[in-house]
Amino acid sequence: MEQTRGETRARRIEQSLIAVKGAGDLATGVIHRLARAGFPVVATELPEPTVVRRTVSFAEAVLLGEMTVEGITAQRASSTQEILELLSQGRVPVVVDPEGRLFRRLHPLALVEATLSKQNTGITIHDAPIVIALGPGYEAGRDVHAVVETNRGHNLGRVYYEGNAEPNTGIPGAIAGYTVERLLKAPVGGKLYGTRQIGDMVQAGDIIAHIHEAGCAGEPCSCQPTPIVAAIPGILRGLLRDGLTVKADMKVGDIDPRAAREHCFTISDKSRAIGGGVLEAILHLMQHL
């Protein structure tokens, strides 16, 4: 009986596996929704994830070994056997696989491009029976089977089976009336070191982090680190991990002016809406396979 159950579980995994490229906070919302709906999910990430909302990102499993977000646990895996074992345990394997070789080995039912790079990263409509992309950069019906809207507003989470998502405006969606003011960006390139923690209440003018320019980090020198300063009051909702190398003008953190600390440790409304769109797209497209 136990062997039969195991065989049934393995067959279900093989037939319904979803591969998600990316495991940042928005991708995590997608992964969480799919896992809760009963799909086995595997995610890929970079060796050094550049994730701002680390407390709600399965990408943290790359460095921590495992990461739990709202009852779903992701764990780093490095082989096909480990992936299958974790899936059989109801966990989400996270694999360092920037080249996407994993997808070709596992033959997933669906592939979700969730890096939100806002440009085509090489995913094609032929990579899986169902291919879905988040946000701009892909055309539904040509590059992928479906595109899910990621821009805050009336269409957030909408599924397009033809055409494109709304173009990238370069301006983040408004939260409590703030847009670009809530973002923390690196004024110069170098290594980032935080002075505050995710979940801290901050005020306008507070120093959130410093950038040590190349050649200065960790070495005695006369260089003065460049501060990153909060423009608005609120809760520090996200901040890159210490020691990461950043480029000038790169997003390194964000402040939530709603000042609700629990928002730092739960999946956002935006992530949930996008996750719902992906689930809808998969279930709809499965009917036409």
Where do the model's predicted regions map?
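Well-ordered secondary-structure scaffolds
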Residues: 2-289
